[in-house]
């Protein structure tokens, strides 16, 4: 086997775990009406894909962890009918990352950022844990929140109670 093939195999072995994200990722946090909800959706990643300067600033950390490839934990809040980013934390030591370090100052209003870049669905469980699935390595919760968002505006928000006897 020549050196080029050996190099390709080694690179593949190194990058496949990164691509597949085999390790369960630390969640972002959503605060809604006093509840703290763990998110498997990462709204800031859509902006990171579109904006290289923000992406570069988010990557400017010494934190490398297989359970947090994005290198930050986003803290979100729903206020009225809108989604806001209210904080960022480093994945390794949980220290706050200043929004001013990552975002242009004119984006920050009242110490939060309106998530006008985000359109999509957020689905998460919260409240009391009712079951654990080894197959999916996740907990199922008494309540399920489903949110449809267009350009940072909440179009639909449904909370379902799960009846698990």
Feature annotation, model-predicted:
Residues 84-141:
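An exposed acidic His-Trp-rich patch
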Residues 23, 121-165:
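Intrinsically disordered, low-complexity terminal tails and linkers in eukaryotic proteins, enriched
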Residues 21-74, 78-83:
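Start-of-domain marker
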Residues 1-26:
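Bacterial Sec-dependent N-terminal signal peptides
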Residues 82-85, 154:
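Hydrophobic residues embedded in beta-strands of well-ordered beta-sheets
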Residues 68, 88-94, 161-165:
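Short, solvent-exposed aromatic-acidic interface loops
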């Amino acid at each position: 086997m020549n050196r080029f093939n050996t190099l390709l195999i080694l690179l593949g072995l190194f990058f496949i775990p990164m691509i597949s994200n085999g390790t369960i990722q630390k969640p972002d946090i959503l605060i809604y009406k006093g509840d703290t909800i763990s998110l498997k959706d990462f709204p800031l990643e859509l902006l990171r894909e579109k904006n290289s300067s923000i992406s570069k600033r988010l990557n400017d950390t010494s934190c490398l962890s297989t359970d947090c490839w994005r290198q930050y934990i986003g803290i979100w809040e729903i206020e009225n009918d809108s989604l806001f980013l209210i904080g960022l934390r480093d994945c390794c030591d949980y220290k706050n990352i200043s929004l001013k370090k990552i975002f242009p100052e004119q984006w920050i209003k009242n110490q939060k950022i309106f998530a006008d870049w985000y359109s999509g669905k957020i689905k998460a469980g919260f409240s009391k844990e009712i079951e654990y699935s080894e197959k999916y390595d996740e907990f199922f919760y008494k309540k399920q929140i489903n949110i449809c968002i267009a350009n940072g505006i909440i179009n639909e928000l449904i909370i379902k109670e799960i009846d698990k006897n």
